[in-house]
Amino acid sequence: MRKHKHTHRGAAISFVFFSLLFFLLFGRFVYLQATGVADGQVLAVEAQKRYLKKQTLEAKRGTIFDRDGEIIAEDIPSYTIAAILDPNMPQHVTDPEETARKLAPLLNMNVADVERILKKKANQVEFGPNGRGISQTLKQKIEELKLPGITFVRDSKRFYPNGTFASYVVGYAQKDEATNRVEGKMGIEKQFDEQLKEKDGEIKYESDPKGFKLPYADEQIVPPQNGKNVYLTIDKHIQTFLEDAMNAVEKQYEPKKIIAIVADPKTGAILAMSTRPSFDPNKRNIENYFNDAISYPYEPGSTMKIFTLAAAVNEGVFQPNETYQSGSYQVGPHRIRDHNKVGWGQITFLEGVQRSSNVAFAKIVREKLGEDRFLQYLHRFHFNEPTGIELPGEKTGNILYRYPIEKVTTGFGQGTSVTPIQQIQAATAIANGGKMMKPYVVDRIVDPESGKTVMKHEPTVVDTPISKQTAEKVLDILETVVTSEKGTGRPYQIEGYRVAGKTGTAQIPDPKGGYLTGHQNYIFSFLGMAPRENPRLIMYVAVQQPNISYTETGAAPVSMIFNSVMKSSLQYLNIQPTVEKKRVKKEKSISLPSYVGQSVEQATQSLKNQGLHVTIIGKGTKVRAQFPKAGEHIVAPDRVLLQTDGNAMMPDVTGWSLRDVMKLAELLQLKPSFIGSGYVFRQNITPGAVVKPDDYLIVELAKPSEIDKKQQTNTEQQETDGPVD
């Protein structure tokens, strides 16, 4: 009986215990069913998080183009390598040692380091900096190893195919680790970041526990939004001429700074802008984070005399044949001297302009115009305010006008400071019939999806500081600065073209007080426009503290840039030279007919008979395309490119000028990039190789003396060169 009692009691206890447990579980079940909440977490949401997968649809940052649609900055594919370690995933790393042994050399890492990463207790790992920014080529090499668990995350990086080309204008963009998006940090990339930036889209769908999409699962798609494309006013050809010339001067004279701007005076469009030192936005080896063309105010020197002269002519107080005593001029306790210290005796004011006499301009400001009226013209030319060019970091100069001596010295560019872009803006009034144009670098912004232009820049007249008649008279006077035997601008004569302009030799303030002394311690400059009869280009060049010998003047490095860039640019724009009769035979302008459809042999012979160099591209028998195009003018012995039918084949460009390489790239729709200056001695595409549009063409250039040996080894020529003797 006792045994039965204990048995019944145990059964009762068990019954009660399991009944309570059942009711607790049932209550919990009812609660979960009713509320859907467990431990503060909404179960439906947690389930959705676990089985709802999200895939990013990558958008593309806007592309930056030059005025003709040549790419200057673009997004290109790059990849981050990752390893899946989760054994529950169908594809995961199964042999860390073997994977590390094969992968390490391609990532330029130690085998032990890779193996350590692959043995981490994590579901997925990456390989640090060596595993990011991987190119398509390297990705393919890794994929060929067929390593289980090794995968790639597609990304993009900003690429600048031309390296240092207009780098302070374009700037650069890079990924911000905090926001995981590319952000503009300098130049156009920064100024137009809102327009250029992209917005990634995404796809959401339900998956099984292994991550595979469930059959018939709905997709939620948010489409990506690509950034807008920005078209600059920069002309790739003119910018290339400028970069090439500046590289040569930098190498030869090792100056502290070089600043140059080329603009269209009719519109204010900036066609080229560059500074030295420069940087490659792909590497970001930046010494100076400011664009000196817009952010470096300094005493301009005698280029400022252009605007003092314009004010005097406009007010009718400049009498070119009136004489004055040059040499020195007293202003209170201060004595102003001409640059040669003694002057040239009694000379006319016209000769004073030609010789860049400080005394002439001191007298114009103080005795002809008057300081108050001169200040009004400084404001009319907007030297008291920034230009508003669409680049970050623009600064304005400082008009020093407190004391009598400052008012007078401002007239010849000393004391008062201005920026190069302010001088360019003011000079448009001289070259554009009195109308001063606002400088700008962005021509238009285009939506890549619709192709619609969302912003178009219209040329803006910011002021009319002088009359059209005054502008013409000033141009006439400035032309004599270049043509007169007494003119300081004689080094800036360009054969076949009339140039008007003014030289500048600006003193550099000494931090200890006063100004630096010495033959080299100046900012040498020239502000010129051509052709005189209808200026199409204005150009400012400044070279600070070049390493010139005592037999050289500051005009040597400045004219080396101005003359070559101005002449090449005028020819490129098909602006006909004013050819003197004695030069007709030497520089005959040739209007090219169309050779398309003709036999290669016939076209080649015709061009060679005109003294032109000819390069044949391809092995066909008929001409399919030519460059320059029909109707364009060239001068013998310029190069003409003839593309034949059939595949386009890369010629040997050894010894070519950068200008000819750019012609080739335009004809074949290649993406050119260059290193160095001078003439080509190395190319990345093998001569004879078939090329396709958008292939990258990289050339290295050097001086002729450096490529002579390489030229001697080239025994096979794939081009037919003229002229015929």
What are these regions, as identified by a protein language model?
Residues 1-282, 372-382, 494, 544, ...:
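Periplasmic/cell-envelope proteins involved in peptidoglycan metabolism and beta-lactam response
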Residues 57-60, 67, 76-78, 147, ...:
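Extracytoplasmic
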Residues 73, 209-213, 217-218, 260-300, ...:
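Beta-lactam-recognizing serine transpeptidase/beta-lactamase-like catalytic domain environment
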Residues 104-108, 147, 174, 197, ...:
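Sec-exported extracytoplasmic/periplasmic mature domains
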Residues 115-122, 255-267, 326, 391-395, ...:
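Acidic/histidine-enriched alpha-helical segments
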Residues 496, 510, 541-725:
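Ligand-recognition elements built from short beta-strands and adjacent flexible loops
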